[in-house]
Design a protein with these regions (language model features):
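Active-site glycine-rich loop that binds ribose-phosphate moieties when present
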Residues: 152-162, 194-214, 289
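Glycine-/charge-enriched secondary-structure boundary and capping motifs
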Residues: 1-16, 27-30, 110-135, 142-149, ...
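N-terminal glycine-rich phosphate/pyrophosphate-binding loops that anchor nucleotide-derived ligands
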Residues: 2-94, 134, 169-175, 314, ...
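Short beta-strand-to-turn element immediately C-terminal to the catalytic PLP-Schiff-base lysine
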Residues: 55-56, 154, 177, 307-308, ...
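Small-aliphatic-rich amphipathic alpha-helix that forms the alpha element of a beta-alpha
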Residues: 77-103, 120-131, 206-217, 230-237
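A generic local secondary-structure boundary/capping motif
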Residues: 42-44, 52-55, 90-93, 125-126, ...
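Glycine-rich anion-binding loops of enzyme active sites
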Residues: 57-74, 82, 98-191, 195, ...
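Acidic-glycine-rich active-site phosphate/pyrophosphate-binding loop
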Residues: 53-65, 204-210, 275-285
Length: 330
């Protein structure tokens, strides 16, 4: 099917780009403090901030539920739909589940952008959901000053074989399945219109195989790297697990052009807020500011951060016994 010819730069209709528009993590934690909870059958999704909620049901199974939506990260409507869908589905894979059904979540400025463009966004989401074997069963839409799109996803999992945020143990290596840098590249794209195909490719890639590989190897701890950056999500994992996480900065992969984007000042506000949040909990050993920003870069549809090793994913550090700081970057 031929794509709709662009009539507008979608990123110009949003104040921020994708997951970089998240409410700052420290502020969000204050807002939701004491408001989460559930019965004994809610085995994930409580105060630790797991990637998805998991509810145990009969027959040794569990229902997985999550929702994610964002503002545009790219100007191409179809690609934005693909990115947003992959990002929403990722939370199911990150906790060890299989997505079954999704509902579209769409906010659209009807007086500013044509309905045909919204259709392209939905088509992109549909195509990625189809790759995941996930049915789309309608959804919800609102007239919104800013375009927003994402999905509420329902899946299934074995409640006794989950990838949990709080299951990290000392002596386990850390692996990361995708390169970092989409946040700063998306910021450059928003400012200049320059397209970064490698960034689009990594953002639209599903984390299905990585999640399955982790389960097959008996791994029990993982999360995905999205709006809070590598350091933010690793901090949450290490804090929940009661360990210290050590990152070997030289082992972390970055997309082509990411360092240049930082040097030219294309750093999202969300990335800077991430770094401010984790810095008091992090021991940086001779790590330059540029490197710190990249490690905290706000991602969308990032890779899985796994406490363990799977084929094709570089080891970027390890978990050790809890020390003075929750994170160490060397």
């Amino acid at each position: 099917m031929t794509r709709l010819a662009p009539v507008a730069r979608l990123t110009q209709y949003a104040h921020g780009a994708g997951c970089a528009s998240k409410i700052p993590p420290a502020e969000l934690e204050r807002v939701v403090a004491g408001l989460t909870g559930g019965g004994d059958d809610l085995v994930a999704g409580g105060a630790d901030g797991d990637d998805a909620a998991v509810l145990r049901i009969e027959g040794g199974r569990a229902v997985v539920s999550t929702a994610d939506f964002s503002t545009p990260v790219v100007d191409d409507a179809y690609d934005w739909g693909r990115v947003a869908a992959a990002n929403a589905l990722s939370d199911v894979y990150a906790i060890g589940g299989e997505p079954l059904m999704a509902l579209n979540l769409l906010g659209w400025p009807r007086d500013l952008l044509p309905a045909e463009l919204a259709r392209e966004v939905l088509r992109g989401g549909r195509d990625v959901a189809a790759l995941a074997g996930c049915a789309i069963a309608g959804g919800h839409s609102v007239d919104d000053p800013e375009p927003k799109y994402g999905m509420a996803v329902t899946g299934v999992a074995d409640p006794d074989r989950l990838l949990r945020l709080d299951a990290g143990r000392p002596g386990v290596p850390l692996s990361l399945t995708k390169p970092l840098g989409v946040g700063v590249l998306n910021a450059r794209h928003k400012a200049t219109g320059q397209v970064f195909p490698q960034a689009v490719e990594t953002m639209t890639a599903l984390n299905a195989d990585a999640g399955l590989a982790a389960l097959e190897r008996g791994i029990v701890c993982a999360t995905d790297v999205t709006g809070f950056g590598l350091l933010g999500h690793l901090y949450k994992l290490a804090r929940a697990s009661g360990v210290t996480a050590v990152v070997d900065a030289s082992a972390v992969r970055y997309l082509d052009g990411a360092r240049t984007a930082v040097r030219h000042g294309f750093v999202p506000g969300g990335t800077r807020r991430n770094l401010s949040w984790v810095s008091p909990h992090t021991e940086f050993r001779r790590i330059a500011e540029e490197e710190r920003l990249l490690l905290a870069d706000a991602q969308i549809s990032g890779g899985l951060l796994i406490a363990g090793e799977i084929p094709g994913a570089p080891v970027i550090g390890e978990l050790v016994a809890r020390g003075r700081r929750t994170l160490v970057v060397r």
